[in-house]
Amino acid sequence: MTKFIFVTGGVVSSLGKGIAAASIAAILESRGLKVTMLKLDPYINVDPGTMSPFQHGEVFVTEDGAETDLDLGHYERFIHAKMKKSNNFTTGQVYESVIAKERRGDYLGGTVQVIPHITDEIKHKVREGAGDVDVAIVEVGGTVGDIESLPFLEAIRQMRSNFGRKNTLYVHLSYVPYIAAAGEIKTKPTQHSVKELREIGIQPDILICRMDRELPQDEKRKIALFCNVEENAVIGCYDADSIYKVPGMLHAQGIDDIICEHLDLSLPPADLSVWNGIIDAIEHPARSVNIAMVGKYVDLTESYKSLSEALKHAGIHTRSEVNIHYIDSEEVERDGCAALKGMDAILVPGGFGKRGVEGKIKAVRYAREHNIPYLGICLGMQMALIEYARDMAGMPGANSTEFDLETDFPVVALIDEWVNHDGKIETRDENSNLGGTMRLGGQECVLESGSLAARIYGAEHIVERHRHRYEVNNHYIDRLEAAGLKISGRSAGAEKLVETIELPNHRWFFACQFHPEFTSTPRDGHPLFKAYVEAALAYQADNK
């Protein structure tokens, strides 16, 4: 029978529940358990696909094409399980399902209420998402005390009655502030947060205290006393310079032993040697490299979370410190490319909308003309193609129809038909809804033999994840190739969509329509990012 660990948060948001939950999962996995993770989001949006990156941060795409919370990216980076659509659901999805059942008459004319109908649907989705694993770790989004979270908290409260104490465990993450003016650590916010949880029927079994310093034993005793938690179950989680140190931090305080005792699990000791190796590589780099990331969401770097982590993973596997310089594409558009001078490589990530596009094109041009390693991802590939069409292929004013419907050279245009992850033909036009209407999830790509792409991947058939609704217009491919652009990867289907491009006469110029960052992990890295960082290091060595 699957056992459930529920992780809640209190006092303030952005405490790092996802990292703490993923770290617990990593420790339990190292002890031989089959583990999965779920994220329950209390917002009413059906999914985060149409939400602004400035409000929500990155949208993480699963292999089966779900647009999900960025925490699922952390889950995949910390454990071996691959997340699916069922690993993340929202209030919007819950209500959508319940209302559909009511319309069908499934409730036999009964009054549909939050309890039991909404809470039953939440419990059903939790069980469905957990599947057949030893332990499912369920992170409840939001902060205890939020109105939006109440149905989710009630559902997980009921699950203890449904499955029993030996099969359920509650972990509460709370903020313990240090007041510098008084020179004191304050436990009262945590006491009140736990009090609020207990009022709705949930008694935490473990308290994780988020702090900027170590938690003294006296404060541990005080928290344990007032929160009705065993003293050894009050765990300190301190600010770390790498999120990959958190599993070791929690394990050192015995959190996995407490969990195993509570859930009646007899397991071999944790083996965190892989994590120790990762930390050693982070702390002892042999070199450093500077990469310019030119985007429009740089004021909130969480918008590029998987991408920045993928670059760090490449640093781990090349024994180098990767310094990411986030550069606003609007500033490049307005002020020119001075901020790019001294960089060892340039990267233009994905994005949507017209704002800052010309700055990204300037960055591409700078990389091409100065022979600096360039990596373009999704929109970054489209920018590279547009720049090349304008400057090298004799198509002045070339553009994407996303930005200019009247362009004479629509080298990038809306995809009107493609085959999705499940093999179903999808069709779209300019009037289609924005939500859930992109080319999403893992798609097979065929790489040209002998190309840079094939050398990077060491294969000619790959699968990478997508999230976009505009594609290279195949009508202009012959003209672009005649001007020297190489199309090195295409989709495996009959539509033969352009997936990768490169410049044979450039030291390292590569761009892809897919999002390789979604499959990079600290354990294995990703071949594309490793090759990119190696190219940046080589450029640095040649230009000392």
Curated annotation (Swiss-Prot):
This is CTP synthase. GO terms for molecular function: ATP binding; CTP synthase activity; glutaminase activity; identical protein binding; metal ion binding. HAMAP family: PyrG. Pathway: Pyrimidine metabolism; CTP biosynthesis via de novo pathway; CTP from UDP: step 2/2. The keyword Ligase applies. L-glutamine binds at residues 351, 379-382, 402, 469. The gene is pyrG. Allosterically activated by GTP, when glutamine is the substrate; GTP has no effect on the reaction when ammonia is the substrate. The allosteric effector GTP functions by stabilizing the protein conformation that binds the tetrahedral intermediate(s) formed during glutamine hydrolysis. Inhibited by the product CTP, via allosteric rather than competitive inhibition.
